[in-house]
């Protein structure tokens, strides 16, 4: 039988397909269970929930210092006309996409590729970074800047030291860790407002670059190439995505189709690139010549997408379906020959009474899948389902149990796995009740006593 956390309890971890719970949120139960096996405790990180953080206005700031009044007025008029035209075309091609954003599994929490450092969106304009390797500092670091408004997505840079990209209104903030005697350097030629320092003790974080999006668009999708050289970004307001050469600060726009973009995912090997749109289409690209193959869905638009670690298989969730889809590549890169196979999550319907899949995350080992879902019966509402995954020619899943968050009526806002945690899958969840909790999923024989 799948493990079910009783109402009022909180989940602590998995031990060999058994999801352990406690009566309240504290480190004591963690020390009694997984800490003996892992040698560390991942304490929950409290944060102020989004609803109580005031949002900044949407109007872009126009720099006019050093210009004459006539030139400044002309620039204002041109800018206003451009804004009117942009808004007109966006209302035609991307009418309600901003209202659909909450249905998409935006990356609101991200683990550093090689460190025990987690970052997550903690408010409309701020990000929290918690370094579990820093034993001297128990407090998280808060990243804020006047340039960082209306944060939607974040992603750690692979092979880039401690460097974090944050998608927000008007562009992408690039943060880097600074140390005494070794301060992070701002990109040559970048804007003068850069160099903002983070708040909090311990490691200081510096805003080293701001990559401006076309027409001040809201960045709502980010994905790094595995080597950390290129960063892909997109907006629900636009049908094109941009590939940034981050070292140069230069972006190249690429467009296919008309719909606004909901999601971008670079494959772990870098050979393929996935782009999904709100009109129900999605594109598979091979990155050798940047050739694409269009796909369309009859089950709504893609709300979740995750690659397997080999980059030869992908799981998709759709807005109008209780069934996942798995993409299997039939040949080696750069071939785009692939087929889509359904993956049934039978228990989601029979046990929870859910109305649809919300978000998904697949750990790098390929053995654990986390799924959140819409609605559900009272006792199942707001839980995360954890599945055991088996990969052969086709993907098969079996339900292990459910994770319940802390507080009253908790709901998962965002979640992600640590891709390189050696002792097993490590799932972090940001809950609507204002806690980011981390759950070790331990089942390997060489760890268990």
Q: What do these predicted ranges mean?
A:
Residues 1-449:
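WD40-repeat beta-propeller superdomains and closely related acidic/aromatic-rich repeat-like regions
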